[in-house]
Regions:
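Alpha-helical and His/Cys-centered functional microenvironments
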Residues: 11-12, 28
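Cleavable N-terminal signal peptides
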Residues: 9-11, 21
Length: 284
């Protein structure tokens, strides 16, 4: 216990002492072409609330609250960045249930919870922005951390790859990605669903400390949704929010609206970001 307290104290000391280095990625989900500076760990955490989520694989529907929505990005070279994403805990207030391939074991009378799936990513900057847009390539995989018996996950490993374009038009930053996602079909043997990944986002700084932003991002399946494909259905979100710099942190909030029938009707997210220098010297 004493060792845990000491380690926590060291982490907090580094967190509050480290100078900010233009930390901004939340609350958007569309990846940009920027690479975090070498030796910098960008730590982002948040809270999500989504209304009327549907889970065809388990037949559950309800309001989802996500605690500890983590995104950690680290620059390991001038053109290379690694990233870890995931959620510490998801809680679903169950408002409805229909027959489905997986019969969930609820953890409460009308609720269920479990750790979220985590993903690992690598991003490579292929071309810096000049007159032509910046170009980056991003690939990664999703790990099956969530137990499908809880009704919130697929217990499947998915692979993703996408190409990112980014261009500044005056003060406006525009970027987007397009690629492919190879998703395991959890309800069918030896089957997968190849889907289109997409995203488009705009960021505009109102002042040196306040920026507004919006996006539409998700994945699209051209196949008809059958029980064999439950868990690989199309998913997408639109987000509109702002980021405020203060006290060495980046504070963000955004409204959320779903794109497809199984997506949340409405929701919001709130979070904070901070850059920590782990190694290397800060440029004067």
């Amino acid at each position: 216990m004493k060792r845990t307290v000491i380690l926590l104290g060291i982490f907090l000391a580094v967190w509050f002492a480290a100078p900010p280095v233009r930390a901004q990625n939340r609350p958007l989900q569309t990846p940009d072409a920027d690479i975090v500076p070498t030796g910098i760990l960008r730590v982002q955490g948040g809270f999500d609330f989504l209304q009327n989520m549907d889970y065809p694989l388990s037949g559950l529907s309800g309001d989802l609250t996500s605690y500890g929505v983590l995104n950690m990005r680290m620059g390991v070279g001038r053109r290379v960045e690694v990233q870890l994403q995931g959620t510490v805990q998801n809680f679903l207030q169950v408002n409805g249930q229909v027959p489905a391939p997986v019969t969930p074991v609820l953890t409460g009378a009308n609720s269920t919870h479990d750790v979220g799936d985590f993903s690992l990513w690598t991003k490579l900057l292929l071309r810096r922005e000049h007159r032509a847009p910046a170009v980056a390539f991003r690939f990664g995989f999703l790990m099956p951390n969530t137990n499908q018996a809880r009704g919130l996950g697929n217990n499947a490993t998915n692979v993703y790859a996408s190409l990112i374009l980014q261009k500044h038009i005056g003060r406006l930053k525009a970027f987007g990605d397009s690629g492919i996602g190879i998703l395991q079909s959890p309800n069918a043997k030896f089957s997968q669903n190849d889907e289109l990944l997409y995203g488009g986002a705009l960021v505009y700084p109102l002042t040196s400390r306040v920026s507004v932003m919006g996006e539409v991002s998700g994945r699209y399946s051209s196949r008809k949704l059958t029980p064999a494909l439950y868990g690989t259905e199309s998913r997408g979100e639109g987000r509109m929010g702002l980021v405020v710099s203060g006290g060495g942190f980046e504070w963000d909030v955004a409204a959320i609206a779903g794109v497809y029938p199984n997506d949340p009707s409405t929701g919001f997210t709130f979070g904070v970001s901070r850059d920590l220098r782990l190694f290397g010297r800060q440029r004067p």
